[in-house]
Structure formats: structure tokens, C-alpha cells
């Protein structure tokens, strides 16, 4: 990477590019994106689109062939958990917030994991776990047809003690 960063989020796009978004450098929180690609067995790094806001601990996933999604995270500038769901339109080359998407149903969070997952014949962005003043045990998916986040379940069995685990990671 060109910029050292921690608490960033990354995803592999259908074209094989590896996008790294946000995070914290040695001196500040970032809203930059770096794109790594390998061609002819050689890594190249280029700058990607700037995010709408600087975030750490957000999740980033492919939503469709033409859209990427950022959900959650923490904004030190706003000194709060992010209430936003930002969509990057690859065809238009810009970020926007869909007005119909409320923040994650069970509350904003940092350090969650999200991934694009096949539900029957449709793909959904699934977000799991994370932290909002306590470890979160809920898993949700974004349903663009219903225009909302849908709770899939909790990450513990009824009657068993709740595990306080917050920091998940996927790749």
C-alpha cells in the first residue's frame, strides 16, 4: 500500500481488483481508497475514489457487479458511530447515500464483518457482529427490494450465556 493504515476495510471485486478503504494512518483518519491489481504477475497500486467521509472500523463489500457498499464505522470528525450506508456506483464513478436505506436495523456499529452472499437467486450484503459500546450478537442483511435491513438472527443460542466478542473479520 502507498499509505500505511489500520482499521481499514477491504474487498475483492468481480474483476479481481483488491480495494482498501479508509482506516487510520499514523497521523489521521483516512477517506482514501487504494486499489491493488495484479497483471503479468506484478502488483500495481493506484488511488481509488475518496470516500464520502473518513471512517475507521467500517465494513466494505461488493453489493452487485456495479455497486459497492460501506456500512457502519466510526467517524472521529463527527465523534460518533456512522449512521450512513454509502453506495459506490462503479458506472458513474461516484458515491451516494440511498435515501431509503436506514442505518443497520439493530444500530450502528464498528468492527463488524460484511460480505456479499447468495440468498437463493439473489445476492445480499450480510453484516455480522461488531461493537457499539458492547459486543453485538446480531446478523443482518440488506434487502434492496424491501428497502431495509433484515435481522437474520443472533449469534448465540437461547439459554446459553452471551459471548462478548466484537471484532470479526472476513476476506
Give the location of each predicted region.
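Kelch-like beta-propeller repeat domains
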Residues: 1-171
